[in-house]
Amino acid sequence: MSFYGSRYFGDIVHGELGKDLFRYHGFVMMVAVAVLVFVMYMGCVILFTKFSYRHFLNRQRLEFWWTIVPMLMLVGLWXPSMINLYYMEEVKRPRWNFKAIGKQWYWSYEFCRNLDTPSSSESAESISCYTIDSYMEDQQETFSKGGYRLLDVDNRMVAPADVQMTAFVSSSDVLHSFALPKLLIKVDAIPGRINRLPMKASQCSIIYGQCSEICGVNHSFMPIVIEFIPEKYFVMWLEALN
């Protein structure tokens, strides 16, 4: 996660896909900077040169290359982008699911006590389900604990780290948006519709996010906090809910 006074972006905890997206971003920026420098250089040459070629009518070879080179650059950007998009949309078997429901102006999480493990033998009838309402924490209490202003909540959602899971996102009133930048996640919460979102945190962490869709007067006071803990402690947390 990011800290106050940090000079860099926060760490991405999305595993190998996050690293691939980070490398792709660096590649795109390298190409963009190279194109910008070349265009500025050619612009300066054309504007400030004292010479001109009066008999220049057309140059087929030049027109060929200034068409082919941008096409090759775009293809070079397209190929890794499509690969990353494919892996981002890849659906894997989840071991745990939870539902995030946006409400004015807090988040409600619904989940069941089952975690898909080789030793799990609970029947569907014996599985207990729970609901957690997560409101923004009072600022005085946040300051006393040294927390983050407008980002901490009274009840954190807890999830297992390094476990493939699925988040089902919806809304009970107006449009919201469930966004966790450190997990590379942003999905709309739409009334009457459930959006499916694969999720996996590669390490134990506390991930902060916010509603990213203007949803009313208290839109800015609708934080999201998910605490990812080791799987064995997560199982103990689920058992303690009973």
Curated annotation (Swiss-Prot):
Taxonomically, what lineage is the organism?
Answer: Eukaryota, Metazoa, Spiralia, Lophotrochozoa, Mollusca
Name of protein: Cytochrome c oxidase subunit 2
Which positions in this protein are listed as binding Cu cation A2? C211, E213, C215, H219
Keyword match Iron-sulfur? no
Q: Where does this protein come from, organism-wise?
A: Mytilus edulis
Where Cu cation A1 binds, per the record, is at H176, C211, C215, M222
Query: What is the purpose of this protein?
Result: Component of the cytochrome c oxidase, the last enzyme in the mitochondrial electron transport chain which drives oxidative phosphorylation. The respiratory chain contains 3 multisubunit complexes succinate dehydrogenase (complex II, CII), ubiquinol-cytochrome c oxidoreductase (cytochrome b-c1 complex, complex III, CIII) and cytochrome c oxidase (complex IV, CIV), that cooperate to transfer electrons derived from NADH and succinate to molecular oxygen, creating an electrochemical gradient over the inner membrane that drives transmembrane transport and the ATP synthase.
Question: Subunit composition?
Answer: Component of the cytochrome c oxidase (complex IV, CIV), a multisubunit enzyme composed of a catalytic core of 3 subunits and several supernumerary subunits. The complex exists as a monomer or a dimer and forms supercomplexes (SCs) in the inner mitochondrial membrane with ubiquinol-cytochrome c oxidoreductase (cytochrome b-c1 complex, complex III, CIII).
Record gene name: COII
A GO BP annotation: ATP synthesis coupled electron transport
The record lists the catalysed reaction(s) as: 4 Fe(II)-[cytochrome c] + O2 + 8 H(+)(in) = 4 Fe(III)-[cytochrome c] + 2 H2O + 4 H(+)(out)
Q: What is its main location?
A: mitochondrion
- Among the Pfam families in the record, one is COX2
Q: Which residues lie on this side of the membrane: Mitochondrial intermembrane?
A: 1-30, 84-242
According to its UniProt record, this protein's enzyme class is translocase
Required cofactors, per record? Answer: Cu cation
**Residue spans crossing the bilayer:** 31-47, 67-83
